C-alpha cells in the first residue's frame, strides 16, 4: 500500500506479504541456518542418522546430506536455495554435500553478527568473495598430487567417502570394488583419465550381508529368461542386442482383410509364423545364442528361439540395453534384416540366477568391458539403500580424483589451514572487508568443530590443538574421530579430492552472498491459503480481518 497526495494506492495484490530491510535479511538467514543445523549432526564418520517418513509412510534412514534435504518438504525460498547447494555439490563431485550446507549456514551466522555492527551487506559480500577466492588459492597450494595408477591411494579416497554409512565392516571390500569398477570404465585421453560414472550400474538385492556385495565384469539385469524351454546358462555367448521387436508389425494404416474360406485364414496364420521364423533364423545364422530385446518377443518367436537353443530376455530398459552393448562390445540392432556376426557381442557366460527371491540375468566375463555392475547385498532394505548411496558418492569421488589427480587431507585439516592463512592475509585488505574475511575464516572452523562434536569430543580442546599444529606447519593435521586425537590425516589415510573442498567453499559462499543481498521479500498469497479445507474460497477469512 502506498499513498499519493493522501489517496491510498493499492500496488500489490490483496493478501501479498512483504518483508523489507533487516527483517527480510534476518528471516532468510534464519531459514538457511535451520536447514544447516538439521544436517550438521550427520557430518563425518561418527555423524548421526536421520529417519525421514514421507506422507505415504515410506521410511528413509540415512546420514547422506543431499538425501535428507531432498526428502524434506521445505517451503521457505531461502531454505530451498540452501538445498540447491547440496544438489549442485552432489552432481558435481558426489561428496561434501553436508560440508557445503553447514558452511553456508555458518557464513550467514557470521554475516548476521557483522550486520548487527552496521556493516553493509555489499561490503560483507565483497569480503566473502575475496576470501573465497583466496581460500581456493590456498587449497590448491596445499593439495597433494597423486599417482592415478596407485590403487591404494584411490582406495583410501573411496573409503573416506564410504565411512560412516553402515558399511564400516566391509570398508576395504567396498572401496576395492569401487576403485576396480571406476578403473574398468575409465578411458585415457591425452595422459588424463575420463570416467563416465553412468557406465557403472548399481543393482541392489536384499539378502546376505554387505560383505557379499560383488563386482561383475559385465551387466546384471533384473529380468528373467522369457521361455521355460530356453537354456538358462550359455557359455561363450554371442550376444545380439535388439532395439526392434521380435513381433509381426502392425500396419499403421487401418486395413480390413476379408476372409471367405478357412484356407485363407490358415495362409494368413502361416505367413505370420513364417515371418517370425525368418526373424529367428536370421539371428541363428548370424551365430547369436543370446538375445536381449528392448521391446516384446512374440510367444511363437519365443518357441522358435527356444527350439534353436537361444537364451532370450525381453523388455530390457534402454539404459540397460546401452550398457549391455558397451560391456560386451555389441552393436545395437534396429533392423533384423541387416544383422551379421560382426554385430554380436561376446561374453564368457550368460546365466539366469536366483538372487534372494527373484531371478536375474548375469552377463559375465566380458573381455574389455566399458560398462560394469556392482551387485549390492545387505540384510535389510534400509541397509541396501544406504550402501547404494555411499557407493554412488565413492564412485564420483574416485572419478574426481582420477580426473584431477589432486587430493587434500580430510578430518577438517584443510579448513583449519585455510582459516589460519586467511586470518594472516585479512589485514592486507584494509577497510571493512577485512572483518568479513576474518568472519569467513571463523566460519570455516565449523567443519572441524562439528566433526569433534559429533564424535563426542570437546570441540574447544580440539580446535586449540588443531590451531597449534597448523601454526607449527603441520598442514595435514586434522581430527581423527576414531582415536579422538589430532593426528596427520595423510598418514591415517583420510584423503579427499581437492575439487570436493573447492566446490563446497565456492558453492557455500555464492549462496550466502545471494541470500545476504536480499532486502525485500514479496510473497504472493499461495493457492493453498486461498482455498479452504473443502476447496472453498477463503473469502470469509478475508472479510473477518
Curated annotation (Swiss-Prot):
InterPro entries given in the database record = Chaperone_TCP-1 (IPR017998), Chaperonin_TCP-1_CS (IPR002194), Cpn60/GroEL/TCP-1 (IPR002423), GroEL-like_apical_dom_sf (IPR027409), GROEL-like_equatorial_sf (IPR027413), TCP-1-like_intermed_sf (IPR027410), TCP-1_chaperonin (IPR053374), thermosome_alpha (IPR054827)
Q: Which GO terms describe its molecular function?
A: ATP binding; ATP hydrolysis activity; ATP-dependent protein folding chaperone; unfolded protein binding
Asked whether the keyword Cell cycle is assigned, the reply is: no
The record's section on Pfam families has: Cpn60_TCP1
Presence of keyword Chaperone = yes
Q: What is the stated purpose of this protein? A: Molecular chaperone; binds unfolded polypeptides in vitro, and has a weak ATPase activity.
Its quaternary organisation is: Forms a Heterooligomeric complex of two stacked eight-membered rings.
**What NCBIfam families does the record point to?**
thermosome_alpha, thermosome_arch, thermosome_beta
Q: What is this protein called?
A: Thermosome subunit alpha
Report the source organism.
Archaeoglobus fulgidus (strain ATCC 49558 / DSM 4304 / JCM 9628 / NBRC 100126 / VC-16)
Lineage of origin: Archaea, Methanobacteriati, Methanobacteriota, Archaeoglobi, Archaeoglobales
Amino acid at each position: 500500500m502506498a499513498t499519493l497526495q493522501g489517496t491510498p494506492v493499492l500496488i500489490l495484490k490483496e493478501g501479498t506479504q512483504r518483508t523489507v530491510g533487516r527483517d527480510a535479511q534476518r528471516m532468510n538467514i534464519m531459514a538457511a541456518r535451520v536447514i544447516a543445523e538439521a544436517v550438521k549432526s550427520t557430518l563425518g564418520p561418527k555423524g548421526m542418522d536421520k529417519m525421514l517418513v514421507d506422507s505415504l509412510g515410506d521410511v528413509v534412514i540415512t546420514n547422506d546430506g543431499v538425501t535428507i534435504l531432498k526428502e524434506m518438504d521445505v517451503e521457505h525460498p531461502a531454505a530451498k536455495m540452501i538445498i540447491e547447494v547440496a544438489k549442485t555439490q552432489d552432481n558435481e563431485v558426489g561428496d561434501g554435500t553436508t560440508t557445503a550446507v553447514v558452511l553456508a549456514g555458518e557464513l550467514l551466522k557470521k554475516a548476521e553478527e557483522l550486520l548487527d555492527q552496521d556493516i553493509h551487506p555489499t561490503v560483507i559480500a565483497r569480503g566473502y568473495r575475496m576470501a573465497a577466492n583466496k581460500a581456493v588459492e590456498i587449497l590448491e597450494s596445499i593439495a597433494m598430487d597423486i599417482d592415478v595408477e596407485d590403487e591404494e591411494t584411490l582406495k583410501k579416497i573411496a573409503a573416506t567417502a564410504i565411512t560412516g554409512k553402515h558399511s564400516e565392516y566391509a570398508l576395504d571390500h567396498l572401496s576395492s570394488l569401487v576403485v576396480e569398477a571406476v578403473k574398468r570404465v575409465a578411458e585415457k585421453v591425452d595422459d588424463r583419465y575420463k570416467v563416465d560414472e553412468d557406465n557403472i550400474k548399481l543393482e541392489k538385492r536384499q539378502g546376505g550381508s554387505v560383505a557379499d556385495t560383488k563386482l561383475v565384469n559385465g551387466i546384471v539385469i533384473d529380468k528373467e529368461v522369457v521361455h521355460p524351454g530356453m537354456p538358462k546358462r550359455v557359455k561363450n555367448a554371442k550376444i545380439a542386442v535388439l532395439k526392434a521387436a521380435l513381433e509381426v508389425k502392425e500396419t499403421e494404416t487401418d486395413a480390413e482383410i476379408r476372409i471367405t474360406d478357412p484356407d485363407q485364414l490358415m495362409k494368413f496364420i502361416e505367413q505370420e509364423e513364417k515371418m517370425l521364423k525368418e526373424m529367428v533364423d536370421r539371428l541363428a545364422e548370424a551365430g547369436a545364442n543370446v538375445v536381449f530385446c528392448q521391446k516384446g518377443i512374440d510367444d511363437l518367436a519365443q518357441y522358435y528361439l527356444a527350439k534353436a537353443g537361444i537364451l532370450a530376455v525381453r523388455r530390457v530398459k534402454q539404459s540397460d540395453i546401452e550398457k549391455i552393448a558397451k560391456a560386451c562390445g555389441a552393436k545395437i540392432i534396429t533392423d533384423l534384416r541387416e544383422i551379421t556376426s560382426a554385430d554380436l557381442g561376446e561374453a564368457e557366460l550368460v546365466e539366469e540366477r536366483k538372487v534372494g527371491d527373484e531371478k536375474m540375468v548375469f552377463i559375465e566375463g566380458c573381455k574389455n568391458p566399458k560398462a560394469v555392475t556392482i551387485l549390492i547385498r545387505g540384510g535389510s532394505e534400509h541397509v541396501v539403500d544406504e550402501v547404494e548411496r555411499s557407493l554412488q558418492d565413492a564412485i564420483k569421488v574416485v572419478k574426481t580424483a582420477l580426473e584431477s589427480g589432486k587430493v587434500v587431507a580430510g578430518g577438517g585439516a584443510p579448513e583449519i589451514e585455510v582459516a589460519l592463512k586467511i586470518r594472516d592475509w585479512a589485514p592486507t585488505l584494509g577497510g571493512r572487508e577485512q572483518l568479513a574475511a576474518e568472519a569467513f575464516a571463523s566460519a570455516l572452523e565449523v567443519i572441524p568443530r562439528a566433526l569433534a562434536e559429533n564424535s563426542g569430543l570437546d570441540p574447544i580442546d580440539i580446535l586449540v590443538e588443531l590451531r597449534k599444529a597448523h601454526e607449527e606447519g603441520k598442514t595435514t593435521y586434522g581430527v581423527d574421530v576414531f582415536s579422538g586425537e589430532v593426528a596427520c590425516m595423510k598418514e591415517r589415510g583420510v584423503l579427499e579430492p581437492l575439487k570436493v573442498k573447492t566446490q563446497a567453499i565456492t558453492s557455500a559462499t555464492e549462496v550466502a552472498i545471494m541470500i545476504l543481498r536480499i532486502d525485500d521479500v514479496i510473497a504472493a498469497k499461495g493457492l493453498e491459503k486461498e482455498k479452504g479445507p473443502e476447496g472453498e474460497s477463503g473469502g470469509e477469512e478475508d472479510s473477518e480481518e
